[in-house]
C-alpha cells in the first residue's frame, strides 16, 4: 500500500543557515485514514449509470454492515461522503468496511479504489528579510544580491490585472495590506473551522503571487481555497476544494483568466494526478511544487501530473538547493530560498521562508502576469509561453532536469518600464 509523504514545502532553517535541510519524510501506517477511500469511476458513464451505481453502493454497504458487523472494529464506515466531478472525471469519497471495498474493486463501473491519506504541512520558522526573488524574475537569470533591498524588478504595469489566482492551501488572510482588497474568500473544506489562515502558508504563497510588495502579479486577484488547517488534511478535503475551484472558474467564465497554485507535494497519488489532468483538458492551468525531498520528482503528486507546470527551486546565484526535487518532470526553476512574503499574525506580518512552495507561486504569478499582458487562450498556450521565455543552462546541479530558469520577458519589451525597490 502506497503511503503519502506530504510536507508543506517551506523548510525550516536556523538563522545564518543558507542551505536548509529537508524535513524527514512523513510516511507510515498512520498516514492512511482508516476505513476511508477515494473511488474513481470509469469514463463514459451516463448520469443515470452513476446514480444507479451510488444506489448499489449504498445497498451493498448497508448489507455488509448488517451481515458482518463491520462497525465492531471501531472503524467509521458511513458510506458515500462526497462526490467530485472535474471535467469528465467522476470520483467520490466514502467510509467503507473491507467487504464493501472488495465489492467496489470488482464493480464494472469502478476504475480504482485508493485509501484516503493524511496530507501534512512541514514546520516553518522566521528568517531575516530577503528580497532577491522578484529581481531575479526580470534579470534573465543573472545572479542577484541575496540581502540587497536595491534590486530592480521590472514589469509591465498590467501586472496580472483582471486575472484570478486560486490558492489551494491553508487559507489566506484576505485583510492583509499586501492584497489591497484584491483577495477574497472562496471555499473552506475544513468542517467546523473558520475560513482564516492560522498556519500562515496560504497567505505567504498568495503574497508571492499577487502582493503589492512581494508579488509577481501585483494587480491580480487571489481566491482562498482552504483544504488545510493547521498542518494536515486528507484527499477527501483536497479533492473537494480542487473540484470547487474548477467549477468556480468554469461557472465564472474565467478559464483564460485564472490559474491554480498548489504548493504541496507528496508521494504519488493517482486520483489527484488524474484531477489535474482533467482540469487541464477543461482549459485550466495548475502550477505545482516539485517537492523538497532532494529526489526525482517523478514519484511525487501532483508534480508528476504531465500537464501541471512543475517548479523546482533555485538560489540567487543559480544553484539548486539540496532540498529541491529535480528530474525530467520538472518544467522550470524559480526562486525558492530565503523568500520574503506575507505571513500570519497580523495584517502587516511578513516572514522569510525556503522551499519549492516559494518557487511555485513565482511561476503562478508569472502565469497571471502573462494572462493579463498577452491574452493567452489555453493552458497549453500558457505552458508554452512560460517555457519559451525561460533562460537555459544556468542552474548548477540540475541533475537530468530541463535546465530552464524563470523570466518574465520584460527586457524584450519596447516601452518605458516601471521599476520596483
Swiss-Prot record:
Glycosylation sites: 248, 261, 348, 388
MF GO annotations: serine-type endopeptidase activity
Propeptide: 17-122
Biological process, per Gene Ontology: proteolysis
Domain of life: Eukaryota
Annotated signal sequence range: 1-16
Its EC number(s): 3.4.21.-
Role of this protein: Secreted subtilisin-like serine protease with keratinolytic activity that contributes to pathogenicity.
The protein, known as: Subtilisin-like protease 2
Lineage of the species this protein comes from: Eukaryota, Fungi, Dikarya, Ascomycota, Pezizomycotina
Gene name linked to the record: SUB2
